[in-house]
UniProtKB/Swiss-Prot annotation:
Its EC number is 7.-.-.-. Belongs to the NqrDE/RnfAE family. GO terms for biological process: electron transport chain. It comes from the Bacteria. Its main location: membrane. This is Ion-translocating oxidoreductase complex subunit E. The keyword Cell membrane applies. The chain crosses the membrane at residues 18-38, 39-59, 69-89, 93-113, 128-148, 182-202.
Amino acid sequence: MSDYKELTKQGLWKNNPGLVQLLGLCPLLAVTATLTNALGLGLATMLVLIGSNILVSLVRDFVPKEIRIPVFVMIIAALVTTVQLLINAYAYGLYLSLGIFLPLIVTNCVIIGRAEAFASRNSVAKSAFDGLMMGLGFTLVLSVLGAAREILGQGTLFYGADQLLGEWAKSLTIHIWQVNTSFLLAMLPPGAFIGMGLLIALKNAIDQYLATKQPKVEQEAPTRARITKVN
């Protein structure tokens, strides 16, 4: 149980793919203009991450080390294609909105990194849980950044939720304030870089604050051994 607790801490906070490892920055910065897009890409990435970890863990004893990376990439590509077809069939608006960044999940270093560093060396259950926590941590960063940019940029939240959840989700759109023109800095990539930097700074500040609250372990002063000369 302690192993799963540690995996949870690593994926959500200590070793978060977005805030600590700084992996997957291309889609993270390009697609997070709205919360809906951020959630869509985050959930797609999480599904691929869980599936790839499970499959890699299953075949880890049968794949020669010399060709393991190409095999892992093929597994990831097959899963991404499956997820892409599902989104195209059931959430076409989101499919158009995500564009090229959906198939680019194949090149996301988070997925290939976890497949190589964890799934290829651990059991199926632990690999699946690691994929879930890492994917959830990545999705949370995407969602927070997407929500902040959407609020600052156009004064709404969950705009276009019907692209992800269907027609009924149009009622989920929240108009926080009325804006005549969009705040372009928040909507464009420079705003994403600034927002991401602020999130990383906030996490580091929280870590430093928590570190100061930890009880300090006092080290015992070394005692000098007294040597008595024996004649």
